[in-house]
Amino acid sequence: MQIVQGFPADAPLCALMWTCSFLLPGLQTETPYPCTSLCLSSSQSAHPPLPVRVFSAESGYGIPFCAEPCSHVTVCHLQAGPVCMPV
C-alpha cells in the first residue's frame, strides 16, 4: 500500500478517505465532523486549533492531531497532518 503525503492539491481526495472527530473540552465522547469542513494545519492562527482525531476508514486506526474549523469547506491543508493512505 502506497502512502502519499497530503498536500493542498490532494486535500479533496484525502478528505474522502478519512473521518474526523472533535475531542471537545468537557465532553467524554467524540463529535463526528467531516474532514472537508476542517483546515488541517499547524500554521499559526488567531484561533487556537481544536484537538481532532482522524480515523482511517480501512483500519479504524486513530491519529490525533490539531485542526481548525474552516469557514469554507474547500480548504483542507494536510502538510502537517496525517498522511493519506489510498484504500
Curated annotation (Swiss-Prot):
Domain of life: Eukaryota
Name assigned to this protein: Down syndrome critical region protein 10
Gene source species: Pan troglodytes
